[in-house]
Design a protein with these regions (language model features):
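Extended low-polarity, hydrophobic cluster-rich segments
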Residues: 17-23, 34-38, 71, 75-80
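Generic short amphipathic/hydrophobic targeting helices enriched at N-termini
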Residues: 1-7, 27, 47, 59-60, ...
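Mixed-charge, Lys/Arg-enriched low-complexity segments
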Residues: 53-88
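Intrinsically disordered, low-complexity regions of eukaryotic proteins
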Residues: 18, 24, 46-47, 52, ...
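Acidic, low-complexity, intrinsically disordered interaction modules
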Residues: 26-66
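Negatively charged, low-complexity tracts enriched in Asp/Glu with abundant Ser/Thr
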Residues: 1-22
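Detector for Asparagine
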Residues: 3, 9-10, 35, 62, ...
Length: 88
């Protein structure tokens, strides 16, 4: 997932992507909610702008690499559907 963000940053001309991953507790101790926030920092702005948010749960049966692959697909889906067209 980090590699795809780096690759996208190599072709963006009007900004840089920043990825924030935040695990949060749930009511069930063995389950974590993982929040993913994708920001863009443009050359004209001093603060990043959130452009994509998605989340998933990590349960004892899940593998973190599966979650990473899923998150990568979410980012690619966003890009393919034109989510970054203003920053190319």
């Amino acid at each position: 997932m980090i590699n795809i963000v780096k690759s996208i940053n190599n072709i963006l001309t009007k900004g840089e992507l920043l990825l924030h991953i935040e695990p949060t507790s749930t009511a069930i101790k063995s389950v974590l909610k993982i929040n993913y926030k994708l920001y863009i920092l443009t050359k004209d702005d001093k603060t990043p702008k959130e452009i994509l948010f998605f989340s998933s749960t990590l349960t004892p049966g899940n593998v973190i690499s599966d979650l990473d692959e899923w998150a990568t697909q979410e980012i690619l889906r966003f890009v393919i559907h034109g989510g970054l067209r203003d920053y190319e």
